[in-house]
Amino acid sequence: MALKDLLSTSPDQVRDIEISEELLRQDLDKYRELIAYWRMYPDRLIDYYCSLNPDNRFHLFFYQRLFLRCLMRHKVVYATFVRAWSKSFMSVMGLMLKCILYPGAKVFTVAGGKEQSAQIVSSKIDEICTLIPAMEREII
């Protein structure tokens, strides 16, 4: 099955198929290839999640795509941006993608105080899940 076929599978088609261990093992190499692709191009995963919602109005700008790719490809990223660049939003989205694509990953965020950090992350997660409902289904 080609990547194009995997991406074009509608949620209705997926619901009709019972997922068994046999079925997963049969296509395991394809899933690994798809996950490796999304690790290099996390913005494409966001595009895929957005395509699942017919009423989607969210899209990434070029510089946001670039920032997400940098976050996923490099261990340490230092960036300075102007006001209203969506720094917190993109950072939290990057952390969420890292947790989705690297199960068991330990991630953290830093702010002036513990409560402030928790408040920022919580509000951004809520905002992301409102804009991209498929991301909410990834949270346990």
Give the positions of each predicted feature.
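Phosphate/NTP-binding elements of NTP-utilizing enzymes
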Residues: 2-140
